[in-house]
Amino acid sequence: MTQVTVGENEGIESALRRFKRQVSKAGIFADLKRLRHHETPVEKYKRKLQQRRRRR
């Protein structure tokens, strides 16, 4: 779960930017996209390949 605490002197815009960055790093949107639609075997293979590359 991604969580961002807003500091006392911090603006909402910067906190929102930090939140978006954390969400994209965690790959939450990619997971949602994957779960929303049917995934063909070729797409599954490509996704796993990307995950392997990302881990390196």
Curated annotation (Swiss-Prot):
Q: Which GO terms describe its cellular component?
A: ribonucleoprotein complex; ribosome
Which Gene Ontology MF annotations are present?
structural constituent of ribosome
Q: Which GO terms describe its biological process?
A: translation
In which domain of life is the source organism classified? Bacteria
Keywords, A to Z?
Ribonucleoprotein, Ribosomal protein
InterPro entries the UniProt entry points to: Ribosomal_bS21, Ribosomal_bS21_CS, Ribosomal_bS21_sf
Keyword Coiled coil in record: no
Which family does the similarity line name?
Belongs to the bacterial ribosomal protein bS21 family.
What HAMAP family is this protein classified in? Ribosomal_bS21
List the protein's name: Small ribosomal subunit protein bS21
Q: Which organism is it from?
A: Synechococcus sp. (strain RCC307)
Phylogenetic lineage? Bacteria, Bacillati, Cyanobacteriota, Cyanophyceae, Synechococcales
The gene name on file is rpsU
